[in-house]
């Protein structure tokens, strides 16, 4: 009996090993979706389908090509943000944005100042970074509340620097803002953490701040309601407990950072290697533990992560890596 149990364990281990290390050598086209071309059209993964947006509108289709929703608008420079079924398209340097709830034609919001960035939460709450003449402003809206659309307004001043990146928590209750400021000829970054619940009501919503004199924080991102990451030209840092933010991990590289990617469980970085055209891919969990490190080519144009897989679009095709670092797909001259 013991030997039978051992055999089953060996077989199970072999099956698991085969699954996590299997490399595919071919593919089958399950479906082809024709997208109507328009000026400056861009696409993004959305709800197991595709969301396309351009200067004149946005639309989402499922994996079978069935339209889920569409909406029209007129924008010069549309930018997209997605959180679960909600999406926001904002006209950068314009004053309009549209919020989509996954089934309607969009709800319009108009701002008083030019838009620099917009983010959406899983409830449809939107945070917008606006450019005023004397200072920048962060405004948080509920587009579906007819009585009080503007929920919070956070002014910034010259002393705090020029905001370059904001992000809204998935539950819509917090914002992180990274700013750049120049003091006595030296450039530094300041990161502010805001909370709109009762936790932050006695401090004008500010629950944490961090100054960096040795790096420029270019992007901030919530991984979930309680974890966030800050990306700089040197590396990244991990923060937890967004009601009382605390840095729990920091990783720097002495080589150029070529790309960074993430999902709600992992953070990845590709740094330049010692040879031209070669790089190192690193994957970390939200505690800062290194999951894997491996060599990759640097001919990629985009890197994203979803469903615990890393998708790398290259100049000639695509590559897919599992979270253990195994390359499962490698296609060149990919044509569908």
Where on the chain are the PLM-derived regions?
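Solenoidal tandem-repeat scaffolds enriched in leucines and small polar residues
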Residues: 138-141, 147-151, 155-215, 221-223, ...
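Short beta-strand elements that form the blades of beta-propeller/WD-repeat-like
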Residues: 42, 46-53, 85-91, 124-131, ...
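Structural motif
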Residues: 96-98, 135-139, 184-193, 235-239, ...
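Conserved small/polar residues in nucleotide/adenosyl-binding loops
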Residues: 2-9, 332-336
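Repeated scaffold domains used in trafficking and secretory/extracellular systems
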Residues: 38-42, 76-82, 113-121, 160-167, ...
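A short beta-strand motif characteristic of beta-propeller blades
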Residues: 28-34, 66-71, 104-110, 149-156, ...
């Amino acid at each position: 009996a013991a030997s039978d149990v051992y055999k089953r364990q060996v077989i199970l281990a072999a099956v698991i090993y085969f699954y996590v290390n299997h490399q595919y050598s071919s593919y089958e086209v399950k479906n082809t979706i024709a997208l109507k071309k328009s000026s400056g059209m861009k696409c993004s993964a959305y709800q197991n389908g595709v969301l396309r947006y351009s200067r004149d509108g946005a639309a989402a289709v499922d994996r079978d090509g069935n339209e889920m929703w569409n909406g029209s608008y007129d924008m010069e420079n549309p930018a997209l943000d997605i959180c679960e079924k909600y999406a926001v398209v904002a006209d950068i340097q314009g004053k309009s944005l549209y919020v989509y709830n996954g089934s309607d034609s969009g709800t319009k919001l108009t701002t008083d100042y030019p838009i620099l960035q917009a983010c959406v939460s899983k409830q449809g709450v939107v945070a917008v970074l606006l450019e005023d003449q004397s200072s920048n402003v962060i405004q948080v809206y509920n587009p579906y509340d007819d009585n009080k659309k503007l929920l919070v307004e956070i002014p910034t001043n010259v002393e705090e620097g020029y905001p370059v990146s904001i992000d809204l928590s998935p539950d819509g209750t917090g914002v992180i803002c990274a700013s750049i400021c120049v003091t006595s000829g030296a450039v530094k970054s300041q990161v502010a953490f805001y909370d709109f619940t009762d936790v932050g009501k006695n401090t004008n919503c500010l629950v944490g701040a961090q100054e960096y004199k040795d790096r420029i924080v270019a992007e901030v991102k919530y991984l979930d309601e309680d974890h966030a990451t800050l990306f700089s030209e040197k590396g990244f840092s991990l923060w937890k407990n967004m009601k009382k933010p605390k840095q729990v991990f920091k990783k720097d590289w002495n080589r150029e950072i070529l790309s960074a990617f993430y999902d709600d469980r992992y953070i990845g970085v590709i740094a330049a290697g010692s040879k031209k055209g070669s790089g190192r891919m690193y994957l970390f969990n939200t505690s800062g533990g290194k999951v894997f490190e491996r060599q990759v080519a640097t001919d990629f144009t985009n890197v994203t992560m979803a469903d615990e897989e890393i998708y790398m679009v290259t100049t000639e095709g695509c590559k897919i890596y599992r979270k253990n670092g195994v390359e499962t797909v490698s296609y060149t001259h990919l044509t569908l």
